Amino acid sequence: MKRQGGYVPARGDAVWITLDPQAGHEQTGRRPALVLSPATYNGRVGLALLCPITSQVKGYPFEVALPNGLAIAGVALADQVKSLDWRARKASRICAVPEDVIVQVLRRLNVLLAGTA
């Protein structure tokens, strides 16, 4: 999504964003991430809910594979959701991710939040 001041991340966007500082097993550095929160929230609040994308596929149950043919490859890590200031961390759009990927990520996240299987 674009607005008068420039790009605002929208749900379903894959973006480059800086994840530092990090601790423990968290992803670090300037990395791709998947935006889960809607552009209306992101633009108004200046934060976005994102999950990192990695090319290191391990077969972990909370990984959601990105389809072939996108400008980015790998898996979204649904259990590593972060709320980040996308302006301060210089988010830039890579591409749009298909809706079915977003649905899969949200379902896996729901397992953690609601305790459902």
Q: What residues fall within each predicted segment?
A:
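Conserved functional hotspots at enzyme active or ligand-binding sites that engage polyanionic ligands
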Residues: 1-117
